[in-house]
Amino acid sequence: MLKPAIIIVPGALHRPEHYQGIVSRLHKLQYEAVAVSMPSLSSSPPQPTWTEDVEAIRKAIFKFSESGQDVVLVGHSYSGILISEASKGLSRKDLPHGEGAVVRLIYMCAIAVPVGESLTGQLEPRTPQEVEAFREEGSISLLDADKVRDVLYNKCEPKVADWAISLLGKQPVTTMSTPATHAAWLEIPSTYLICEDDLAVPECVQLRMAKQGNGAFDIVRCQEGHAPCLSNPDLVVRMIRNAAGEAIEI
């Protein structure tokens, strides 16, 4: 049976290179896998919305789906919104028999929003626990380089964190305030990886998003920070394989 293709969508500031450890491991397991470059990253002038990012993801999907291969989309952080938008009209129920579909969405400490909300809106503290979490852990300013190591890469080895920081690009702020037009997690089976030691998107905020939709998400937990692909790539690969249909323990 043909395995689904795995498409990884980078989070804000990040490039495909940040996810190559996952891609290479999946290749060794006979998965077709790719991390997609986002046109908005370091764009000049800055792109006003995520529209071109979504189009880049859809092109990657069609590369596999047009030949009948199903696809699993993996979104990290900000790109949770993008994988939902890119899946519009591509679920199994939307497509005729024989065409590949988006069969699962994976949210890695990612933003999952209802229609009409944005990343910035979803990260506004809504409970006393969330207010306290942001006060103690600090919500990252994308322009504050001094916080990047501690907030994004707190569970990574120092050399890995240095390398990751050296690759970071600039993220147009307006892409993060663009409201969602589609909530694919309500119609496509979805997995949410809660990273309990995440200092960028606190655990309680991840849990709130993962509990949306009356059980829409299969919830998986790990004791990683905001960059599990770098701090524990083997765990992430096991999680992806499980979500893709393999009967393995995470």
Swiss-Prot record:
Phenotype when the gene is knocked out: Completely abolishes the production of novofumigatonin, but accumulates fumigatonoid A and asnovolin A.
Described function: Alpha/beta hydrolase; part of the gene cluster that mediates the biosynthesis of novofumigatonin, a heavily oxygenated meroterpenoid containing a unique orthoester moiety. The first step of the pathway is the synthesis of 3,5-dimethylorsellinic acid (DMOA) by the polyketide synthase nvfA via condensation of one acetyl-CoA starter unit with 3 malonyl-CoA units and 2 methylations. DMOA is then converted to farnesyl-DMOA by the farnesyltransferase nvfB.
Any one biological process term the GO annotation gives: novofumigatonin biosynthetic process
Record-linked InterPro entries: AB_hydrolase_1, AB_hydrolase_fold, Sec-Metab_Biosynth_Hydrolase
Hydrolase listed as a keyword: yes
UniProt-listed PANTHER family: AB HYDROLASE-1 DOMAIN-CONTAINING PROTEIN-RELATED (PTHR37017), ESTERASE_LIPASE_THIOESTERASE DOMAIN-CONTAINING PROTEIN (PTHR37017:SF11)
Keywords carried by this UniProt record: Hydrolase
SUPFAM superfamilies per record: alpha/beta-Hydrolases
EC number: 3.1.1.-
Active-site annotation: 198, 226
The name this protein goes by in its record: Alpha/beta hydrolase nvfD
Gene: nvfD
Taxonomic path: Eukaryota, Fungi, Dikarya, Ascomycota, Pezizomycotina
A matching Pfam family: Abhydrolase_6
Keyword Transferase recorded: no
